[in-house]
Amino acid sequence: RSLVSLVGTDSHTEKLGLYSGFNLVEYAAALEIPEGKLRFVDQWAYHNSIPNDAMAAIYTASDVLLAATMGEGFGLTVLEAAACETPAIVSDFTCQPELVTDDSYIVGGQPFWNSAQNAFWQVPNVGEIVDALEAAYARGRFRSAAQRRLALGYDADRVFAEHWRPALVRLTEHAREHAPSGRTKPTPTPADGPLLTI
């Protein structure tokens, strides 16, 4: 467990840092982490996508996913890990708490204004992250059936059928009812057909 493996899908985990991320090589040196104790994802593979089966193996091999973020919107990686029964450590910010069950960990943080995005972000509390990591370590190897059940609720086909299709049908009906005069009105379609026919 002395080896830290960083696997990421955004600029905050780029080896040399981009955007609001930071240079992880310099950061590791500042923390005096010995060489060989920190491993980075192959940066070429990282940019060209890690195959799904490899990601599933990484999630399954992990005791916990550390995904405390400053401003992650939805957090697909949390659900990917959940689908592999891997609990997560997430920020008490955005929708992240909705993506974990009671056997995962939620950490607080300090809000700050990100003027580039014109929105508040949150800097995760490092002490709480350490506490969560230590709790996960103390718990030992653990698989979360609850996390998997939660992830299945976000299945793309299910979400589309139960949420998106009805919303798009309502939007189509609204557009048909409120189309300006002289413009072609959309024709409603059956529930299993295309969403909009003009």
What is the predicted role of each segment?
Residues 18-57:
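Nucleotide-activated donor-binding/catalytic signature segment of Leloir-type glycosyltransferases, i.e.
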Residues 55-56, 79-83, 94-98:
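Short alpha-helical segment that forms part of, or immediately flanks, the ligand-binding pocket
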Residues 63, 85, 92:
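A short alpha->beta transition loop at the rim of the catalytic pocket in nucleotide-sugar-dependent
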Residues 70:
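Aromatic "clamp/platform" in nucleotide-sugar-dependent glycosyltransferases that forms part
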Residues 78, 87-90, 104-106:
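Short hydrophobic beta-strand element within catalytic cores of glycosyltransferases
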Residues 124, 128, 138-167:
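A charged, aromatic-enriched C-terminal amphipathic alpha-helix characteristic of glycosyltransferases
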Residues 135-139, 157-188:
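C-terminal alpha-helical cap of glycosyltransferases
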